[in-house]
Each structure stands twice: as C-alpha cells, then as structure tokens.
Amino acid sequence: MRVNVLQHTPNEGPGAIQTWTQARGREMYVYHPYQLGHLPTADETDMLIVLGGPMSPNDDLDWIKQERALIKQLLAAHKPIFGACYGAQQIAKTLGYAVHASPVKEVGWAPVTLQSHAIPDLPATSLVLHWHQEMFEIPDEAELLYSSEGLQNQGFVIPHEAIGLQFHFEPLADNVREMVVNDGAYTAGSVLNETPQDILATPVPAENQETVFKLLDYLTD
C-alpha cells in the first residue's frame, strides 16, 4: 500500500502516522504542495493523509484547489483519507460543507470526548493537541466523532472511507517541540490559556499513538 502524505509546513510532520506506516509495512511518500504545487495522482495513491498547516481551505490558491480535486477523486474511488486540522477542513470543503471561524481559538492541550462508536475500542476521552481557530461543518455523509467543551465539531468519520479531526493525535514529542518553537506566538488569544512553556511541559500521552493506529487500521482493514 502506498500512503501519500500532504505536508503543509515543515513543523507539522506525520509523527505517529509515520510510525504506523513502518509498523504496518506501508510505503510512505511525503509531498509539500505549498512549496512546488506538486501533488500525487489518484492512481498512485492507495491512502491519502492530509496534515495541518497555517493556511485555510478558503485561501484562493491553485494548489489548495488541486488538493480538493485529488480528495474528490479518492472519495469517488473509495480510497481511504485521513485529515488533521486543515486536512480535515479540506475534506469537509471538498464535500461542499463550510469552513469558517470557530467560536473559540484553541491552542494547547485539552480533552476531546468520543461521540460515536463507529470505530471500535477508542477511548471515551483523550487529551489532544489543539492548534486552530477555524472549524468545519460536519458533512451529511459523516458521523460526528469527537467534541470538546469549547467546540462541538472536533471530528467526523465517513464509515470506512474518511476521518477528519480538527485537533492532533499524531504529534510525537519532537513534533510538538517543532510546532511550539516555530509557531509559539500562535498561543495568544487561545481560550485554553496555555503558554508555549505549558504546552512543552505536558508529556505526549502514549495512548494517542495507540489511537492513531486504531484510526488508520480502521480505514485500511
């Protein structure tokens, strides 16, 4: 299986997703469309991972539109897609649903609560990394998967085809450090009231990698 990853900033890498590809014997290729505008084709993609980034799906950029064209092709072909943050927003927008300002800006560690049992054996609550101020509307094709105290629409699942999460399960400790070092000023105005130092002081929950494995296994089994 060829897993193609769309990465949108140097400081938001695949983290535990790469660990999963290695453990499952998948081939992983990373693309940086924001740099050169180059994307994989649908034919050379068995699974697509769309990571986060500082841009918005509403930005009028050709490569962002080309990403959605690829997502549309893969959804039509029933090939699995996983999106984190901006990536989840891209899936929702591809399906015709709005991406807009969130009622609250969330940056830092905070719990999310599971809202669906479509995917077996997920924890009822998880401590995850938030890094966003926009949100998606839940597609009619999908089930609400996660919510938080500040935001209902934290995640969705289109059964066996796509998962979109507004937050991040995938960062390992090095990924968190890269996000904070390169984008620590983004914590200003967050309702979570965490400083960059607070974020770095919180250990990455080991169960988050386990959850990444369960989510990606669900999409590919």
Which residues does each PLM region occupy?
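Short gly/ser/thr-rich secondary-structure transition/capping motifs
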Residues: E27-Q35, P111, V128, L145-S148
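Flexible gly/pro-rich beta->alpha loop and the following alpha-helix that scaffold active-site loops
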Residues: Q22-F82
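Nucleotide donor/acceptor-binding cores
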Residues: M1, D46, S126
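Short glycine-/acidic-enriched loop or helix-start segments at secondary-structure transitions
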Residues: G15-A16, D59-L61, A92-T94, D140, ...
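Catalytic nucleophile loop
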Residues: L74-A98
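Amide-donor transfer/coupling interface in amidating biosynthetic enzymes
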Residues: V5, H100, Q115-D221
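N-terminal beta1-alpha1 ligand-phosphate binding loop
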Residues: V3-T21, Y31-Y34
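Short, solvent-exposed loop/turn segments at secondary-structure boundaries
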Residues: D59-W63, P103, P123
